[in-house]
């Protein structure tokens, strides 16, 4: 195949799972084409002399035969295969890698723990929104990476010898989910963390991001149970008590926890509790990408943008031919409304960002059809890949777009968990009003307005005589007041 291919592949031979990511480069960003993950549990095949068993190696090779079929379509220069903790440790890693290279037809690189940490950080920096100064945590099968950084630059990198597979074999070997086993696992993890904790705290962070299967599992549990998606020590302790209550690993049942993730969940949970405790982490969210994304973006030599969300919104506006001027116009009106009521409603900066994002995409449904455009918009946003936005934030955006006009579906605003239900209602009200007053699609036709909030009552003051001079506008606003009143949102217009 010619080297003009836009396909790239990244393969990560992890201690618990092997992963393959195949992407296509599209206008400076990546479009995911294939994700394959297989639980190989390589680390479980290490004996006391750190030799890999033949069975574990065979499981790995079998998985790579599946991957090899997909790699035939991609130029070798656009494939990167890396091996991590278990193959750093195994005394017979050379035997495994020689055959792996033969199967895949390309080199396999065993990377150092620091290089693994750097790549994980790059993957997060390219795909995850939020504050610029971050702490990234990745709990693997046999190692845990902790990285601090600002923007694209790392400030400290650590790869520690503990992982969910090795801790499972060491502290939950009897498969008992007893308090003593958790205590021993947490104590050992804290001892591993202690030598690096001061340096991590010295560099500091504004946001903490988790980039591993353990954190993914926690996110799935919390979404399934209707909680908000922020991981806190309190929630981790509750899940630990739930696990202890189940008694044994084979009887572990928690809403939202898949069978595939259950085996290494308690050991991963113990490590995460130790990290939260030792580093005094307040809350953590899930990263948009990690090691494989870091490999791909490294091959593409793409720079890390300061604002991932803005890049995502720009790409989608281009792809769906959204009228960018109109999106900006609505966003400007919405931002003005938000700034006038934020103190009375105690709204946070992230809510403003999410409202502006909804404005940028509010006409995406028109790319399908004018009829049911809000439903089309909600469907598209729910199902598009939106780097920089968490799953809960995507759901909120979809819900706001569903309710941008026509009667309000209050239950949908209450089913999202990115923000409290009351905040979702408030953002929805501001979006609807902004769309109405920017509907003439000209900056000079947007009236000067003041918006005041008094508890749930919104009072909108228009220029004198505006309602008389704009009979259609008056009718639309009267209809909007009626729709808002149906869901007990009082709106007065003067």
Curated annotation (Swiss-Prot):
Biological process annotations from GO: guanosine pentaphosphate catabolic process; guanosine tetraphosphate biosynthetic process; nucleobase-containing small molecule interconversion
Protein name: Guanosine-5'-triphosphate,3'-diphosphate pyrophosphatase
Keywords for the protein's UniProt record, in alphabetical order: Hydrolase
UniProt family annotation: Belongs to the GppA/Ppx family. GppA subfamily.
InterPro entries: ATPase_NBD, GppA/Ppx_hydrolase, Guo-5TP_3DP_PyrP, Ppx_GppA_C, Ppx_GppA_N, PyroPPase_GppA_Ppx
EC number: 3.6.1.40
Gene3D superfamilies: 3.30.420.40, Exopolyphosphatase. Domain 2 (3.30.420.150), Hypothetical protein af1432 (1.10.3210.10)
Species in which this protein is naturally found: Escherichia coli O17:K52:H18 (strain UMN026 / ExPEC)
Classification via CDD domains: ASKHA_NBD_EcGppA-like (cd24117)
